[in-house]
Amino acid sequence: MPLPLVFLVDDDRDFLEMEAAILAAGGYRTRSFSESRAALDALAAAEGEQLPSLIVTDLMMKSLDAGFTFARAVRSDPRLRNIPIIIVSAVASQKGFDFRARTSSDLAAMNAEAFFDKPVTPAAFMAKVKELAP
């Protein structure tokens, strides 16, 4: 059986490489995308084992809320809506906004199962990944 697949969506190449290395060490395959449109196209074309077990996306890419828009698009597709989503962002340090979820309702509004501020602690990140995509 193939390793679980995680789609990584972030316009920061260094962060993509770091996330991919952490996930590979934890026993996951990854596909990386530097923009949400490319990830949505790949999701639309994916079938079976090409569908990810988990999606990790940045919040701020081409626009401040690109990650929210991407997550909303994933949730609107019946084929994809049950794929767990983790949003990671430097929005707090870069823009001063606090998007940390305090309740399950906050996460539901984000269309995500988890939210992490960057920099992400690898242990906390992997614990959540293993919870959502064992």
Q: What are these regions, as identified by a protein language model?
A:
Residues 13-31, 110:
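Two-component/phosphorelay signaling modules centered on CheY-like receiver
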Residues 65-69, 91-116, 123, 127:
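Alpha4 helix (beta4-alpha4-beta5 surface) of REC/receiver domains from two-component response regulators
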Residues 10-11, 58, 118:
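Acidic di-acidic motifs
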Residues 41, 66-81, 102:
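Short amphipathic alpha-helix used as the core "switch/output" element in two-component signaling
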Residues 50-53, 79-86:
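His-Asp phosphorelay/catalytic-motif detector in bacterial-type signaling
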Residues 16, 62-64:
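The feature encodes the CheY-like receiver
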Residues 32-54:
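Acidic, metal-coordinating helix/loop segments flanking the phosphotransfer/catalytic sites
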Residues 58-59, 89:
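Active-site residues of response regulator receiver
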